[in-house]
Design a protein with these regions (language model features):
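Carbohydrate-binding surfaces in secreted/extracellular proteins
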Residues: 121-130, 135-166
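Acidic/proline-rich low-complexity IDRs
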Residues: 7, 12, 19, 44, ...
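Extracellular/lumenal carbohydrate-interaction signature centered on repeated Trp-anchored short motifs
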Residues: 5-11, 65-77, 133-143, 167-172
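Short, flexible coil/linker segments at or flanking structured domains
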Residues: 2-3, 44-46, 135, 165
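Active-site-proximal beta-strand/loop segments in catalytic clefts of secreted hydrolases
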Residues: 16-18, 82, 95, 148-150, ...
Length: 172
């Protein structure tokens, strides 16, 4: 059985598309912290997309993303995502920081946060080097991505990079 998100110590945010019946204006945070995500643009809900569970689909359009209040002490993140081959989006974005900056590989060697670059990154349980592993081909199928950072990082969006165009998630 699935854990009650509120029982997990230190949980800041839990967005679970399988709970959704529509891509409404807000996405409820299951952590109990009230970090609900506001929909911007037209991300869509795809019902029964994976083992009867719903997903949210993003087109890569500059207006399509979800945003919540800044969380600036992020240490461990889990995603279930799929990237389309044309994806230019970050795994997480922010209104002012670019800690999750990529450059075709998971992490940009100069622009991503050293706390992200030096962290422990896994895709489907396999440890990978985020500085040399191609992101889009690694995430061509729905995948579980985990990251444990070496220090605090900040994010407030999935997934839009500050106000830079062409850096929104394209995939699920």
């Amino acid at each position: 059985p699935m854990e009650d998100p509120k029982s997990l110590s230190g949980m800041k945010l839990w967005l679970d598309a399988s709970d959704l019946t529509s891509a409404g204006s807000s996405w409820t945070d299951k952590s109990g912290n009230g970090n609900d995500a506001t929909k911007n643009g037209s991300p869509t809900l795809v019902a029964n997309a994976q083992n009867t569970h719903s997903i949210i689909r993003y087109t890569g359009n500059n207006a399509d993303y979800h945003e919540w209040s800044d969380i600036n002490d992020i240490r461990t993140i889990f995603w279930v995502v799929k990237a389309n081959s044309s994806n230019q989006g970050f795994l997480l974005g922010d209104d002012s920081q670019y800690h999750f900056h990529h450059n075709q590989v998971f992490w940009h060697s100069g622009h991503s946060s050293s706390n992200v670059r030096n962290g422990s990154l896994c895709v489907n349980g396999q440890s990978i080097n985020g500085l040399s592993t191609q992101m889009n081909s690694s995430l061509a199928n729905l995948s579980i991505v985990s990251l444990r950072t070496t220090g605090n990082v900040e994010a407030s969006r999935f997934s839009r990079d500050r106000n830079s165009g062409g850096r929104n998630w394209n995939g699920d």
